[in-house]
């Protein structure tokens, strides 16, 4: 059994097709959506979205946060930004984590703690996504 899934960002539609399962990172941990799931709307934290497409092939995306809507015949992910996990660069993600950590440690008079922690959380989620993909698929 499959359900139609759309992943949409501010830049446009990133994915549209039939999937057997959607696994996303919500506020209370990972959530798996299969055909027949009860209707639901929840917010998503930065991290990977894994799609098990029709036929069992997996495709992974990174989202910087957003919302997940589940209806009887449709799953929709509305995200701020979306990248295919294969397009993420581990070295860049590590550098972003280090830069965010440095900014947190070197607070100045005009320091914005909320912005700095948000940058750190997003960079760490990107790095986690890259590492999960590399571990799972040996890339």
Curated annotation (Swiss-Prot):
CDD domains associated with the record: F1-ATPase_delta (cd12152)
Compartments where located: Cell inner membrane
Any one GO cellular component localisation term in the record: proton-transporting ATP synthase complex
Principal place of residence: membrane
Alphabetical list of InterPro entries matching this protein: ATP_F1_dsu/esu_C_sf, ATP_synth_F1_dsu/esu, ATP_synth_F1_dsu/esu_N, ATP_synth_F1_esu_C, ATPsynth_dsu/esu_N
Entry keyword ATP-binding: no
A Pfam family it matches: ATP-synt_DE_N
Mode of membrane association: Peripheral membrane protein
Keyword tags: ATP synthesis, Cell inner membrane, Cell membrane, CF(1), Hydrogen ion transport, Ion transport, Membrane, Transport
Molecular function GO labels: ATP binding; proton-transporting ATP synthase activity, rotational mechanism
Highest taxon, organism lineage: Bacteria
Functional description taken from the UniProt entry: Produces ATP from ADP in the presence of a proton gradient across the membrane.
Family listed: Belongs to the ATPase epsilon chain family.
Quaternary assembly: F-type ATPases have 2 components, CF(1) - the catalytic core - and CF(0) - the membrane proton channel. CF(1) has five subunits: alpha(3), beta(3), gamma(1), delta(1), epsilon(1). CF(0) has three main subunits: a, b and c.
Name the record gives this protein: ATP synthase epsilon chain
Species the sequence originates in: Pseudomonas syringae pv. tomato (strain ATCC BAA-871 / DC3000)
Underlying gene: atpC
């Amino acid at each position: 059994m499959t359900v139609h899934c759309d992943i949409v960002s501010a830049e446009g539609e990133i994915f549209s097709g039939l999937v057997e399962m959607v696994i996303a990172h919500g506020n209370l941990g990972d959530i798996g959506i299969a055909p027949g799931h009860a209707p639901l709307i929840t917010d998503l934290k930065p991290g990977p979205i894994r799609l098990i497409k029709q036929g069992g092939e997996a495709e992974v995306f990174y989202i910087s946060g957003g919302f997940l809507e589940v209806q009887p015949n449709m799953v929709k992910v509305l995200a701020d930004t979306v990248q295919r996990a294969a397009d993420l660069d581990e070295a860049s993600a590590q550098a972003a984590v280090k830069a965010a950590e440095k900014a947190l440690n070197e607070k100045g008079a005009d320091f914005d703690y909320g912005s700095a922690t948000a940058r750190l959380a997003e960079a760490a989620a990107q790095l986690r996504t890259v590492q999960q993909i590399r571990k799972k698929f040996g890339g």
